[in-house]
Amino acid sequence: MIQVAGVNFEDPIVIASGIVPPTKEYMQNVCEKYEPSAITSKTLTYSPLEPHRSPTFVKISDNCYLNAIGLGNPGIQILRDLGEIKCKLIISIGGSNVNEYIDAVSKINDIPVMIELNVSSPNRRGFGESNLTYVEEIVKNVKSIVKKPVFVKLGPWDNIVEIAGRALSAGADGLTLINTLKGMLIDVEDFKPILSYGTGGISGKCIHALAVRVIHDVFKEYEPEIIGVGGVFDWRDAIELISVGAKLVGLGTVLVEKGFDVIREIREGIGTYLEEKGLKVEEIRGIGVKR
């Protein structure tokens, strides 16, 4: 059992945002069949958003992708249709200004155990770095409305440690690190971007080392509660993120690449590693920073 911001999780493995469609049937099937400690919803906004037109997703190399769905989602109202599901639900919320976050959060019911504020999407204008100028205001307003733990999802920017500090000082209960890294690919036949949006978020194994560095630096400065996300493809990757400060580890691209069965593989791999070392998972957290 792992306690994060007062919430108990069976083990460190959760599903990151953007993977599981926000429908009761799909979520319930994933919960029952694969037993993740929690599912993080797709980012939901107050009003529905249309996704960018195709192509929105392209494979860069083995275990590495570029995507720009553009936060397409049915809106926060879908939450009332989810009902009770048998694993914990973390709701990801997005917006282009403070009021949109407030409006969306005001619609949240008792289903989620935690709220994740996505202030770092690189794939829709006005929904990413522009939010950082008022991250404190977003956090303070959300915390004044909800009693659930609030985590802030940040991207791998150069000033990430400073921004993390601002979010925590404003009252965030923890951080989700990291979001995707903005990139671009060009078609050499017509010399236009391959993705319809132009740029996209780089995800997968190619950002794992970046995630390790960011989590390390933020944990070293503040020792906050962290959900670590970024290129986790096996139990070693998960242990690595835990060793630099993550309490929970989110799986994303690996589920696209290998399917949901990998959840069990990674969980069992962590268990075997800990048993062989004679360690508990809490003894590993942050050890790579403190040594």
Curated annotation (Swiss-Prot):
Binding-site positions, substrate: 42, 67-71, 118, 179-180
Keywords from the UniProt entry: Cytoplasm, Flavoprotein, FMN, NAD, Oxidoreductase, Pyrimidine biosynthesis
UniProt subcellular location: Cytoplasm
InterPro entries: Aldolase_TIM (IPR013785), DHO_dehydrogenase (IPR050074), DHOD_1B (IPR033888), DHODH_Type1 (IPR053488), Dihydroorotate_DH_1 (IPR024920), Dihydroorotate_DH_1_2 (IPR012135), Dihydroorotate_DH_cat (IPR005720), Dihydroorotate_DH_CS (IPR001295)
Record function comment: Catalyzes the conversion of dihydroorotate to orotate with NAD(+) as electron acceptor.
Family under the similarity heading: Belongs to the dihydroorotate dehydrogenase family. Type 1 subfamily.
Protein name per Swiss-Prot or TrEMBL: Dihydroorotate dehydrogenase B (NAD(+)), catalytic subunit
Organism (species): Sulfolobus acidocaldarius (strain ATCC 33909 / DSM 639 / JCM 8929 / NBRC 15157 / NCIMB 11770)
Gene: pyrD
